[in-house]
Amino acid sequence: MLMLSKTAGAIPRPPRSNVRGFIRRFNVQPRALFHHKLVLGIETSCDDTAAAVVDETGNVLGEALHSQTEVHLKTGGIVPPVAQQLHRENIQRIVEEALSASGVSPSDLSAIATTIKPGLALSLGVGLSFSVQLVNQFKKPFIPIHHMEAHALTIRLTHKVGFPFLVLLISGGHCLLALVQSVSDFLLLGKSLDIAPGDMLDKVARRLSLIKHPECSTMSGGKAIEHLAKEGNRFHFTINPPMQNAKNCDFSFTGLQHVTDKLITHKEKEEGIEKGQILSSAADIAAAVQHATACHLAKRTHRAILFCQQKNLLSPANAVLVVSGGVASNLYIRRALEIVANATQCTLLCPPPRLCTDNGIMIAWNGIERLRAGLGILHDVEDIRYEPKCPLGIDISREVAEAAIKVPRLKMTL
């Protein structure tokens, strides 16, 4: 599990020669007349270097992304200094590609939006330092972006979704349920008490040595689990969902990881193989842990919907559940959430898979949303700092727990 600093960070000094070269290349007069507001979004919160230009109507004019997945697969996880160096090596190129694809010069931009919280400190610093130099050079407003708010609002780029709506954000670094009441108003109903589901699935995949599996060698851990689980029998092993007696909307995945690890150790002894070799029962284990994860996410989400309905926080006639984040691309988990949505008369919406994972489009779009609402637009960036740890919205999880809502049993026929 990656440990993040709890304090806001000063901006590291970037390689100025590269930025100057970038500025010289784009320090030209606007090449076209744009009638809409334009925002450049920059994302470096973890291990993806991404940028995009989006206009106020939601058109994506240009985008670019550099993924570090293959590098970190070899090390068994994200190494922050390595991620930082790769961001430094690629950020100029990625921003240039996004601008070039869009036909937009920095002079055409209405603002520059960049993720400054939460995330890996070393990674956040790279994006922020590069952005600050662009802001200062081209005299553009700066819009600091909360990474999880951007994930939550991405759905409004692809669908006509009004406020309020419920969002489940599930990824390798986050797991939370929140009610989105406006562009900047969030009520946190529950969150992971330990690790995120994507992190847990990655750890299980590493413990199963799926990188050595011929079908999974280039996949992330979560993708490998989903792929292998299709060949497995989830009934072969009993892995129970966590926190079944806790009547809140919080999550926990550490216990699920430990139970699975013990099961793998037991099967290794039973099959007479050493740690690091692939079990004959790997697919069955993958199927069982995926099912337990899906059931855990579904039950907490079910309770969140019931709470919002009881408190009249969601419109009964037009209730929407949005699921986003990297784990939202897991179709098995999505089917479990569809069962919950159908049982509660909610509409389940998910952004396209490429917008569920980290990307520059969601950052630019969040910038557009804030620009239109006149929220968080800075003209002085001298004191701006990144924040590796930053909660989402107002935490009302205690109120949810005190309601002690009993969730009716649903048949998870997946």
UniProtKB/Swiss-Prot annotation:
It catalyses: L-threonylcarbamoyladenylate + adenosine(37) in tRNA = N(6)-L-threonylcarbamoyladenosine(37) in tRNA + AMP + H(+). A divalent metal cation binds at H147, H151, D358. The keyword Acyltransferase applies. It comes from the Eukaryota. It is found in: Mitochondrion. GO terms for biological process: tRNA threonylcarbamoyladenosine modification. Keywords: Acetylation, Acyltransferase, Metal-binding, Mitochondrion, Transferase, Transit peptide, tRNA processing. One of its GO terms (cellular component) is mitochondrion. Residues 1-29 form a transit peptide. Monomer. Required for the formation of a threonylcarbamoyl group on adenosine at position 37 (t(6)A37) in mitochondrial tRNAs that read codons beginning with adenine. Probably involved in the transfer of the threonylcarbamoyl moiety of threonylcarbamoyl-AMP (TC-AMP) to the N6 group of A37. Involved in mitochondrial genome maintenance. PANTHER family: TRNA N6-ADENOSINE THREONYLCARBAMOYLTRANSFERASE, TRNA N6-ADENOSINE THREONYLCARBAMOYLTRANSFERASE, MITOCHONDRIAL. This is tRNA N6-adenosine threonylcarbamoyltransferase, mitochondrial. It comes from Rattus norvegicus.
